[in-house]
């Protein structure tokens, strides 16, 4: 057995305690051992989360028989009043309203581009020119009515284009065919 002097042990102990005092311990992450563990199994999903009252679960998107369209597609079809408010919003933001229509597929599909992501390969046809001078939602809704009259069995969407950043900022379906 090797003998170690008590002076060497004291030096090691002093260095260890001095080093521990120089650096504050990291307290950002906590050990999971500090969390309470529930021993009983609870199959009632409403008790998992709480907003101060009883949580009611709601199905957000039906998994069968409903195609995904654009922004707001999870809502029922927008009324004329709701469409006017959306158009007023995009005009207020300084975006240029534009109408586009699609005769066959108004939902997400990949035909011209196969990689995942925002771009899904759809090309819509522009209805007339963008409404550069539009100051009121009624002007856009009149164009929407004209497009509906010309192509009643088409998908029609309203987009808001930011000509400074050169990006499309908003897009939503304003009209769907009767069979959708």
From Swiss-Prot:
Q: Where is the transit peptide?
A: 1-56
Q: What single Pfam family name could you report for this chain, choosing any that match?
A: RuBisCO_small
Give all cystine bridges in this chain.
none
Q: Which domain of life is it from?
A: Eukaryota
SUPFAM superfamilies in the record: RuBisCO, small subunit (SSF55239)
GO biological processes: photorespiration; reductive pentose-phosphate cycle
CDD domains referenced in this protein's UniProt entry, alphabetically: RuBisCO_small
The record's subcellular locations are: Plastid, Chloroplast
Question: What cellular-component terms does GO give this entry?
Answer: chloroplast
Q: Is Transit peptide one of the keywords UniProt gives this record?
A: yes
Cite the record's note on assembly: Heterohexadecamer of 8 large and 8 small subunits.
So what does this one do? RuBisCO catalyzes two reactions: the carboxylation of D-ribulose 1,5-bisphosphate, the primary event in carbon dioxide fixation, as well as the oxidative fragmentation of the pentose substrate. Both reactions occur simultaneously and in competition at the same active site. Although the small subunit is not catalytic it is essential for maximal activity.
Protein family membership: Belongs to the RuBisCO small chain family.
Record protein name field? Ribulose bisphosphate carboxylase small subunit, chloroplastic
Q: Which organism is it from?
A: Medicago sativa (Alfalfa)
State the gene name recorded for this protein.
Answer: RBCS
